[in-house]
A protein has these predicted regions:
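Catalytic cores of carbohydrate-active enzymes across secretory and cytosolic contexts
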Residues: 1-203
Length: 203
């Protein structure tokens, strides 16, 4: 565990008539070589790199909002890769219920095998939990074993989750119903019809 410097790139909405976009990079001379490579590949197969990317996405993204003096009423996690943000927000707000008021989660992967799980000790060693003790992490998340299940933790931290179609919502509810303490999983259909979602400037 050591500090990693992060640079935020900003894409102005006027460039492509899009929403504002922030991109995070660790490829900076202030970082050692290993830290510089955290953002070199998307979905890196190396577990330590992947955990570092998840810290950057979740904790880094939430910290960026604070650095920019934004005060989001809601944090939306599109898949569970950024759930480390919940531990940053727990530290910021002081309790899980305050985090739950501000967190929603979209789940995509309907297969149990596709849910990310990593060694909880490794995550603790890498600073994933923002300095929280492991027994506190276990109590907060309900994770009793050695494997940290990102999607399950996201479902326990969020006030609401959604699947990406009616059928997927049903499949997701069946997949997770055996677990205690999860939020409601609704369904929002991903629309591909431009009449529903595209800005007029795009067509």
């Amino acid at each position: 565990e050591h500090p990693v410097w992060v640079k935020a790139w900003y894409l102005n909405p006027e460039t492509f008539k899009s929403a504002p976009l922030f991109l995070l990079s660790t490829d900076l001379p202030e970082n050692d070589y290993v830290s510089q490579t955290i953002t070199h590949r998307l979905y890196d197969a190396n577990v330590a790199t992947k955990v570092a990317q998840f810290i950057l996405l979740g904790v880094g993204g939430a910290k960026l909002m604070d650095e920019l003096n934004f005060n989001p009423g809601l944090y939306h996690l599109n898949e569970a890769h950024g759930i480390s943000a919940a531990f940053y927000l727990d530290k910021k707000y002081g309790n899980k219920e305050e985090v739950k008021k501000r967190l929603v989660f979209t789940t995509h992967t309907p297969e149990e095998a596709g849910k990310e799980k990593h060694d909880i000790q490794k995550k603790k060693k890498m600073g994933y939990f923002c300095g929280m003790k492991l027994d506190e992490v276990r109590e907060l998340t309900g994770m009793a074993g050695d494997q940290f299940n990102h999607s399950l933790v996201a479902l326990r931290f969020a006030k609401l989750a959604n699947g990406v179609s009616q059928l997927h919502g049903e499949v997701s509810r069946n997949l997770w119903k055996k677990f205690e303490g999860i939020c409601e999983i609704k369904a929002i259909t991903n629309a591909q019809n431009w009449h529903y979602w595209a800005d007029k400037q795009l067509y």
